């Protein structure tokens, strides 16, 4: 048997996050700047969490109002607190609620930055609107942890697999920008960290310029999750007995078989 832990044996997110955050120190100690902790919440994947978002210190990336139809499915940036201080109760309650579900539901990432909220929000808004080939238009949905993993790359010990990064190193550095560390949970429920210090290249300018090959890689990489989303939405009984990691690999396997029959459209793939 492999020595790697199974998906079920991974430590709870509350435990791993507490250990990791307690180890984080500001990068510019001489300047005395604390690291600010932020939550980037993908409300569309777990709408119940929006009710726990505090009234202050939270902004929708698309600037929608909280009670609007769009605001209820928009990604939200929430300031939780800073290093060296305990979180206030509303922020801690929100973080706990996220940590309780994030290993099974990829709905949030955590960010640490010396920037205050307005500066970080401005950076994320610039980064999410890349230049596309042939004047196409689309947002870079890095608030979805699975998209973030595709953009920056991710290794998974449990499946012994690796997602190669869609972005070039200079583009990855540009996406991180003022973000010192960016955390998400992998498909097998493990905490994964991206650190700005890991990218030595000079950052590319924003907005990012994506090539046709990069766009195609993002689209193809997102197909399994898109199909799972529609299955969960319309026919949840089909996946009741499969945990998220197993469901993802099942979908990827079936896509290989479906494409052998020449099936490519979303409806055809779902029916298959």
Protein language model regions, located:
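A contiguous, surface-oriented mixed alpha/beta subdomain in the mid-to-C-terminal portion of proteins
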Residues: 1-72, 77-78, 82-85, 92-93, ...
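Short, charged beta->alpha transition segments
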Residues: 90-98
């Amino acid at each position: 048997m492999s020595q790697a832990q199974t998906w079920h044996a991974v430590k709870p997110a509350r435990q791993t996050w507490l250990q990791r955050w307690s180890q984080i120190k500001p990068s510019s100690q001489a300047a005395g700047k604390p690291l600010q902790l932020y939550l980037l919440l993908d409300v569309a994947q777990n709408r119940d969490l929006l009710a726990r978002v505090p009234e202050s210190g939270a902004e929708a990336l698309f600037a929608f109002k909280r009670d609007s139809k769009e605001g209820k499915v928009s990604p939200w940036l929430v300031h939780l607190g800073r290093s060296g201080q305990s979180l206030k109760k509303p922020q801690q309650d929100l973080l706990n609620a996220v940590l309780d579900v994030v290993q099974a539901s990829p709905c949030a990432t955590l960010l640490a930055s010396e920037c205050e909220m307005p500066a970080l929000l401005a950076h994320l808004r610039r980064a999410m609107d890349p230049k596309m080939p042939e004047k196409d238009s689309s947002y870079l949905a890095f608030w979805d942890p699975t998209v973030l993993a595709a953009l920056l790359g991710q290794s998974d010990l449990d499946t012994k697999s690796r997602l190669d990064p869609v972005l070039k190193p200079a583009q990855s550095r540009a996406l991180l920008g003022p973000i010192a560390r960016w955390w998400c949970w992998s498909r097998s429920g493990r905490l994964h960290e991206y650190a700005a210090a890991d990218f030595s290249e000079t950052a590319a300018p924003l907005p990012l310029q994506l090539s046709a090959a990069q766009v195609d890689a993002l689209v193809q990489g997102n197909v399994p999750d898109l199909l799972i989303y529609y299955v969960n939405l319309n026919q949840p009984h089909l996946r009741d007995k499969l945990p998220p990691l197993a469901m993802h690999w099942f979908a990827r396997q079936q896509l290989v078989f479906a494409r052998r029959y020449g099936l490519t459209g979303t409806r055809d793939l779902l029916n298959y």
